[in-house]
Amino acid sequence: MLPTVPFGELNITRLIVGGNPFRGNSHLNAQLSTEMLEFFTVERIKKTLAACEAHGINTVQARGDVLIQACLREYWAEGGRLHFIAQTASELRDLSGHVKQLARFGAVGIYVHGTFTDRHFLEGTFQ
């Protein structure tokens, strides 16, 4: 097992799986983002999660969107045990409802995506 840190009542590995590649967010260039989207099918996402878990990682941090939730639902149904830290999906307008849905889904942690926070801060509508 990899080194862990306390996270509420859980211990999560200090190394966690990041979900940006699964959704084509390379932060490098559009071509790489496109290649990631083409490569990471549902099956490849689940295989990647399983490989990470097999190597001792116990947590994934990813968007809490419909695709990622579907992948995780299948992964968990097939015996996967990764903890899920969810980032809110900026395209969903009901932030409070989305956070509640992610909690019901099983996210062990939820954070608001930075673009949502930035936009509301700049508009003076941050609550």
Task: Give each language-model segment a name.
Residues 48, 98-99:
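Generic hydrophobic alpha-helical segments
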Residues 54, 109-110, 115-116, 125:
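Positively charged, amphipathic N-terminal segments that serve as targeting/anchoring signals
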Residues 19-21, 62-64, 86-90, 112-114:
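A cross-domain feature marking catalytic cores of carbohydrate-active enzymes
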Residues 77-81, 103-109:
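Glycine-enriched alpha-helix->loop->beta-strand junction motifs that scaffold or abut catalytic
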Residues 27-43, 84-94, 117-124:
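Active-site mouth loops of central-metabolism enzymes
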Residues 1-78:
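N-terminal binding-site loop/beta-alpha segment at the start of enzyme catalytic domains
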Residues 64-80, 91-98, 116-127:
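Active-site-adjacent beta->alpha loops and helix N-cap segments on the catalytic face
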Residues 51-52, 101-104:
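Generic structural signal for hydrophobic
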